[in-house]
Regions:
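Core hydrophobic alpha-helical transmembrane segments of single-pass membrane proteins
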Residues: 11-13
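Sec-dependent signal peptide hydrophobic core
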Residues: 5-9
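N-terminal presequence-like segments and the immediate start of the first folded domain
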Residues: 4, 16-90, 94-99, 104-107, ...
Length: 166
């Protein structure tokens, strides 16, 4: 089971902003053109460590009531995509820290968005990338448009996979 999870995490790697940590290696094709701007890495090889799977995060506080309380939904889930992504990434960063990890340990970011409009991928990716850029790190990334998330007001959910030292 452990090998299967390791293999699955290695397969789903695809980018955001950075040079990798000691246990990660950014993989590029032999014909990689460094003049082309890529906001993510094509692949990340995990050389050692343990896989850390974060639950999907939202703009709601990490610890919130289930089922959701309407007043919390209205307080945190406004109609501002960038604000929801920022609050979500703040929660992701708190969870990474609690697990003894940092943004440089992230190997993959899944971004689920509802109500996609022209430019949403660029806007949401720019906010996500801003959390990795100071660490010169580009995790692999998957952007997906979905029909709906947990609440009608929810515009984004983000899940992260990281690798931490043994």
């Amino acid at each position: 089971m452990r090998k299967l999870l390791f293999f699955a995490a290695a397969l789903i790697a695809a980018p955001v902003y950075a040079q990798s940590g000691n246990n990660l290696e950014i993989i590029h094709h032999p014909n990689y053109d460094k003049s082309v701007f890529m906001p993510f890495s094509p692949a990340i090889k995990i050389k050692s460590g343990k896989i850390l799977w974060l639950a999907g995060g939202t703009a709601l506080p990490v610890y919130h009531d289930h089922p959701h309380k309407r007043e919390q939904v209205l307080q945190y889930l406004n109609n501002d995509l960038e604000a929801q992504v920022r609050r979500t990434m703040d929660g992701v960063m708190e969870t990474l820290k609690a697990a003894g990890a940092s943004p440089k340990d992230v190997v993959h970011v899944f971004i689920f968005r509802t109500r996609p409009r022209m430019g949403d991928i660029g806007r949401s990716s720019a906010v996500v990338n801003s959390y990795f850029a100071p660490h010169n790190h580009k995790p692999t990334t998957t952007n997906m448009a979905v029909l709906e998330l947990g609440e009608p007001e929810q515009l984004v959910e983000i899940q992260v996979v990281a690798v931490v030292d043994n």
